[in-house]
Amino acid sequence: MERIKELRDLMSQSRTREILTKTTVDHMAIIKKYTSGRQEKNPALRMKWMMAMKYPITADKRIMEMIPERNEQGQTLWSKTNDAGSDRVMVSPLAVTWWNRNGPTTSTVHYPKVYKTYFEKVERMKHGTFGPVHFRNQVKIRRRVDINPGHADLSAKEAQDVIMEVVFPNEVGARILTSESQLTITKEKKEKLQDCKIAPLMVAYMLERELVRKTRFLPVAGGTSSVYIEVLHLTQGTCWEQMYTPGGEVRNDDIDQSLIIAARNIVRRATVSADPLASLLEMCHSTQIGGIRMVDILRQNPTEEQAVDICKAAMGLRISSSFSFGGFTFKRISGSSVKREEEVLTGNLQTLKIRVHEGYEEFTMVGRRATAILRKATRRLIQLIVSGRDEQSIAEAIIVAMVFSQEDCMIKAVRGDLNFVNRANQRLNPMHQLLRHFQKDAKVLFQNWGIEPIDNVMGMIGILPDMTPSTEMSLRGIRVSKMGVDEYSSTERVVVSIDRFLRVRDQRGNVLLSPEEVSETQGTEKLTITYSSSMMWEINGPESVLINTYQWIIRNWETVKIQWSQDPTMLYNKMEFEPFQSLVPKAARGQYSGFVRTLFQQMRDVLGTFDTVQIIKLLPFAAAPPEQSRMQFSSLTVNVRGSGMRILIRGNSPVFNYNKATKRLTVLGKDAGALTEDPDEGTAGVESAVLRGFLILGKENKRYGPALSINELRNLAKGEKANVLIGQGDVVLVMKRKRDSSILTDSQTATKRIRMAIN
């Protein structure tokens, strides 16, 4: 009451009223600003003001039991006065120091596990190399980049379920962990975070960083993988760049990189097969990248690259609506067109049928090393503003834009015939014919395009037909800009269709992608790519084909064995034997095949002459179209390691070595697997079937000299006798028949007599 009375007295004096109304603080807006709401309006000032007080901190009453009233220097750590408006204690900043030095300690074992991404970032920075700083104009373009190194690729929903299961396992709510990656991560995190004392909310937040890809649309000049983006603020400014080599790689970047390589290899291989789409799907489904199924990665990974998008389209996934031409991503930003077939004549008077886009359109063109804005009308380039890292990159963009414009002077600039073909030896479509032609040599195109004088516009210069810059003249309609063109930022995905030749179209029928757009660049994948499909065996060379073929036979031996005896033709036509044919000398393929098929037929005709190892060894040779000949072979040649190597019909060789004791097969010294059944099950083995034209007289007779091998028998005259080594090392006496007889009767009697002779 005293206070109020005092205030009333003050207010009655005119001077007080004048001070309060005339000075600026009475602005109601200002008073409101600083007094309304719980949000601190000037945190820095508030902090300074608070810290100037003796006890700026409030704490729970329990602190009085945990901290002494005074420290060793005798300074007071907390005040006995209660905090106004609450039952908390006023505490000095010195109490924090005391607590840090003398307070209870807790286990730090979980910190690196929870704050894994931070710890890993520090390691990468420690081992990274920072190079010199260069001052130069930076052409940055906004790209969608991954800002979060070291993450898995779960969707937000999948990650949410994993986090709930790990951090709040007892909370109610339906959680369905279906994908393999979800289950693996959940199991691993539960084990690692047992008895973790860190606040659950913090754990949840850190887990999210580890599980979900976070992307931002940022201006970048240079590397776009996440280990570069995390140091973007250190490596590029407006007018400077600092060289940097990351001190470590992260799995998400490695997956992105390996996925692109796998997709390119698969699309290239599918293009040359009889049914590209079916082959592509078969390969995507049977390939693993770093131990994860490629189809799972494709479903989760947002990487946009031509080959990757073709694979996604084949799987029925949505992809970006932009289209690709000449290695540039085109996005229409305004205008529209209708398509019409038109016949045009090249400078060489060759007729081309092109699909002309009629109408005014504007596009952004984004490539790895150059970007541009293109404005065009029907078969006319109106304006192209291009920016790039160097002369070469700018020239590439200009060629693509000139071809895309479909201008007559471009078509008339063609010298010579257009007959480019793709990997499957099919002619390319006319637009890609033109593109390839000018990518090889664009001199005539640039000379014929025409030049024009230019106005002085800030940030733009001209470019001459020889690709040198100029401030006076430029190629008609074309300017070079210092500023880059941003990548298309939208993450919108559209439904597309794909035909059997892997051409991807949007719902209006526009071609977005085709195999011609897939880069030929070869790279080495960071993660192991395992192609289980036989179509990809060739990728690692002849040795890989050889080993993979035999591994496949051994893995599938149960079914192969049945087919071998019941339906050999179907077996010989299996695509798994296709790659092997490239190893067999062309001239010998048909003869080898005929010989092996005859041999197999003899085995089938004669019971008990089944030799597993020999069938496995010779089977791939039977896949070629057979030639009927009476040729006999003791060995078959395959071209590996740069020369012909022999596979012996009987017995082991460096190429094909079967160890009876371990039952394991080695091909070129590499393990190709184990035979689960006993290969000796066929008693006498295949040899009896090869004894065509011989009579078996009985057991070995030393009078006739040492045992010959089956191949040496060929030299015997009719009626001559000899000892011969057959089967598993048994020796019998034979006589060459005086007349030719059927294979069948010979083989049947041979089998019976061998049994008698041995027993």
Curated annotation (Swiss-Prot):
InterPro entries linked: Flu_PB2_2nd (IPR049110), Flu_PB2_6th (IPR049114), Flu_PB2_C (IPR049115), Flu_PB2_CAP-bd (IPR048298), Flu_PB2_middle (IPR049111), Flu_PB2_N (IPR049106), INV_PB2 (IPR001591), PB2_helical (IPR049113)
Which Pfam family is an annotated match for this chain, by its short name?
Flu_PB2_1st
**Which key words tag this protein in UniProt?**
Cap snatching, Eukaryotic host gene expression shutoff by virus, Eukaryotic host transcription shutoff by virus, Host gene expression shutoff by virus, Host nucleus, Host-virus interaction, Inhibition of host RNA polymerase II by virus, mRNA capping, mRNA processing, Viral transcription, Virion
Residues forming the motif Nuclear localization signal are: 736-739
> What Gene3D superfamilies would the database entry show?
Polymerase Basic Protein 2, C-terminal domain
* Any GO MF annotation of the entry: RNA binding
Q: Which domain of life is it from?
A: Viruses
Give the main location: virion
**Cellular component GO terms, alphabetical:** host cell nucleus; virion component
What cystine pairs are annotated? none
Q: Per the similarity annotation, which family is this?
A: Belongs to the influenza viruses PB2 family.
Function according to Swiss-Prot or TrEMBL: Plays an essential role in transcription initiation and cap-stealing mechanism, in which cellular capped pre-mRNAs are used to generate primers for viral transcription. Recognizes and binds the 7-methylguanosine-containing cap of the target pre-RNA which is subsequently cleaved after 10-13 nucleotides by the viral protein PA. Plays a role in the initiation of the viral genome replication and modulates the activity of the ribonucleoprotein (RNP) complex.
Q: What else is known?
A: SC35 was derived from A/Seal/Massachussetts/1/80 (H7N7) by serial passages in chicken embryo cells, thereby acquiring a multibasic cleavage site in its hemagglutinin (HA) and becoming 100% lethal for chickens. SC35 was then passaged 11 times in mouse lung, yielding the mouse-adapted variant SC35M.
Q: What is the annotated quaternary arrangement, including any partners?
A: Influenza RNA polymerase is composed of three subunits: PB1, PB2 and PA. Interacts (via N-terminus) with PB1 (via C-terminus). Interacts with nucleoprotein NP (via N-terminus).
Its protein name is Polymerase basic protein 2
Per the UniProt entry, what species is this protein from, by scientific name? Influenza A virus (strain A/Seal/Massachusetts/1/1980 H7N7)
